[in-house]
Every structure is written in C-alpha cells, then in structure tokens.
C-alpha cells in the first residue's frame, strides 16, 4: 500500500525561468550587451563551459551553507568563461554567483504544486529527494513548499547524487522509509532506474515533453498521481 510520495525538485515541481539552471535570472543584464552578444553567437562554447564547470561542481559537492554555495559558483563561472576564452571581471562573476544562489526569482513552481501537495497530504506523506545545493531549502520555504513537506534529502548534504542508488538508500535511512510503500517521481529515466533498484515505485514526470520510454508510468502533473497509486494498490 502506497503511503508516501517522494518528488524530485527540478523539472517535477519547479523549473528555471531562463530555461537553464546555470543561467540565473539576471545573467545577460549582469554580463552587459557586448558580452551577451558574444554568448548568443557562441552557445555551443557556453554549453561546453557549463559541462566543464559542472565537473567541478560534481567533484566538490559536499557543502552545507549558502555561503559555501556562493563561493562554489564563483569558481564555476570562472571555469565557464575561461573555457569560452572570455575575460570576465571578478565583480561580474560575483554578481552572477549571487544571482544564481540568492535570487529566488530564478525559479518558478508549476501551477499545480501547492494545491497538489496539499491534496496529496490528506492521504500520504510528501517528501523531496533532490540533486541540489543548500539554497533549495530557502527557495522551498519562501515559496510555501517547505512547510508542506514531511522530509527533504539534498544531495549536497551527503556528496551523493541520484546518479547512483546511494542517495536513495540514504533517504530510506534518514527519513525512515519503506521504499515498497513509496512512489518516486522524477523527470529522468536514469534516476528512476536507480530509485527502482532501491525499492521505490518509479513514476516518470513529463511536464512539457513526450515520454522517451514506456518502462514507467507517465504523468503530466500532480493530479495524475492518484490513478497511478490506484493501479499499484490494486496489484
């Protein structure tokens, strides 16, 4: 019997306003017109820079404070623009890092999230497991989501991500879960595979795209969850 619903965060409950988690809300305004034009015509190089910068983030993922996160994103943007061979001043990198960490406007929650979670909580515990940074807790709180949750596990607190089964096993222990009684909702089939390996019932969220696999139940929004739960409970 399903009694707990565990969500991923990005792509499931919220999305980056810019369309990219590494492009904060004021990215182009901070860079200025000239640098913005360079980037627009060198998007391939920018993406390569993000890949290189993300390697640094992944290798240094154990952090607990927003101050540590800010310092990490200062280094991240240095790597990105070095990879692009663009001269960006320290003051600009500081502003980008500040915008990436401290500006809640960089994300939007989907319209069904608050009411959807409230409805689900009448019959289920609701939790989040996310590959993320310390500022997520503040973003959740400021958007009225944190107080609705029965549990939150963030990858940065454990230096583990959903790319392996480890973070799911940590969540089982930390949140006292029986994974056989839990749905896990994510927009990444590879994450769902690891969740299933840990014993969770995987559900694929496809907010804006067509499902790339028929291996898992697919939902378009939180209202679709009851039907999935009903079919699982019948089994």
Q: What are these model-predicted stretches?
A:
Residues 38-51, 90-101, 200:
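Short, well-structured alpha-helical segments
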Residues 23-30, 75-80, 135:
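A general alpha-helix detector
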Residues 1-7, 87-89, 114, 118, ...:
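Asp-based, Mg2+/Mn2+-dependent phosphohydrolase catalytic module
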Residues 52-97:
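A metal-dependent, Asp-based hydrolase signature
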Residues 16-18, 112, 132:
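Acidic donor-diphosphate engagement hotspot in glycosyltransferases and nucleotidyltransferases
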Residues 71, 88-90, 98-127, 165:
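Short, acidic loop-to-helix structural element flanking the phosphoryl-transfer center
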Residues 54-68, 104-111, 166, 200-201:
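Short amphipathic alpha-helical segments at helix boundaries and their inter-helical linkers
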Residues 1-51:
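Active-site neighborhood of HAD-like aspartate-dependent phosphohydrolases
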